[in-house]
Design a protein with these regions (language model features):
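Non-catalytic interaction/targeting regions
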Residues: 1-282
Length: 282
């Protein structure tokens, strides 16, 4: 009689103890370490502003100094972006006024996931600082951009000059039209779109249609001081400027059908046999 009893057991746990991850969202990899489940150690990347221009000095002793910051990552702009946050200008002559410092703020950054391209920031605020009074803001310029899609990126929708509390002095508003266009030889066909442009294959034309300048000067509502309206040659042409209307009475309107002070009509000539177009005729 022979008996050979036996038993076997094993137990194993696998987990990473070291990895490279962007923990703080600054666009650079950090070192992440963990020797036990209750502890996590992060060594942050120190690259930051490395190799970004810091200052320039001219032959007369004047300098300008740049500073940078990383924007907060958002759904629209994952990972954020390194941007210029401040500019200090010193002309080297200190008896003619204080050093000038300008700070910059960026909002509504957009990265198009489909195009894999950065479309810009929806709002950029340029702040003039009082360097003799604790760097307090005394004036700011606000610029708004259309970052809705690839075709409209970079179009300025509004600009304004404001005081430190956001009360406007002046404002400019822009309105654009949107067209899909198709080409038949040298002739284009334009199809107007009133919604966001979106296509993998189509070409688009997004011209400036209307501009209004407003004056506030402390009031809650602005007064229109001037307007401009543009019309373009479309089907059968190439989107050339056709006419321009101007009014300083505030009566023109976004459709261009109101009263105006003067209008300019533009005509072009071409040499179609040689595919040469858009020569200004009058």
């Amino acid at each position: 009689i022979s008996t050979n009893p036996g038993a076997s057991t094993s137990h194993s746990i696998n987990r990473p103890t070291y990895s490279l991850q962007d923990v703080d969202g600054d666009g650079y990899l950090d070192i992440v370490e963990s020797e036990k489940e209750s502890e996590l150690k992060v060594t942050r990347s120190a690259i930051g502003r490395t190799n970004m221009l810091k200052s320039v000095t001219n032959s007369l002793g004047g300098t300008f100094t740049l500073d940078y910051a990383h924007t907060t990552p958002t759904y629209g702009l994952p990972g954020g972006k390194w941007v210029m946050s401040a500019l200090t200008v010193d002309d080297g002559i200190h008896d003619d006024g204080p050093v000038m410092t300008t700070a910059f703020e960026y909002k509504d950054g957009k990265r198009d996931r489909h195009e894999r391209e950065f479309l810009g920031f929806g709002e950029v605020i340029t702040k003039n600082l009082d360097t003799e009074n604790g760097n307090s803001v005394y004036r700011q310029a606000v610029e708004n951009y259309d970052v809705a899609n690839y075709y409209t990126q970079g179009n300025v929708t509004a600009t304004s000059v404001e005081d430190a509390n956001g009360n406007k002095y002046t404002e400019t508003k822009n309105r654009y039209d949107s067209y899909y266009l198709t080409a038949d030889g040298d002739k284009y066909t334009f199809a107007k779109r009133d919604v966001n442009l979106w296509s993998d294959r189509a070409s688009a034309f997004v011209p400036l249609r209307y501009t209004a300048n407003l004056q506030y000067e402390g009031a809650a509502n602005g007064v229109v001081t001037s307007e401009a309206w543009n019309e373009y040659y479309l089907n059968g042409y190439h989107g050339e400027l056709k006419s321009y209307k101007y009014s300083d009475k505030g009566s023109l309107g976004e459709d261009g059908n109101g009263k105006f002070d003067y209008a300019t009509a533009i005509k072009y000539t071409d040499n179609a046999s040689k595919h040469i177009f858009d020569f200004l005729l009058m």
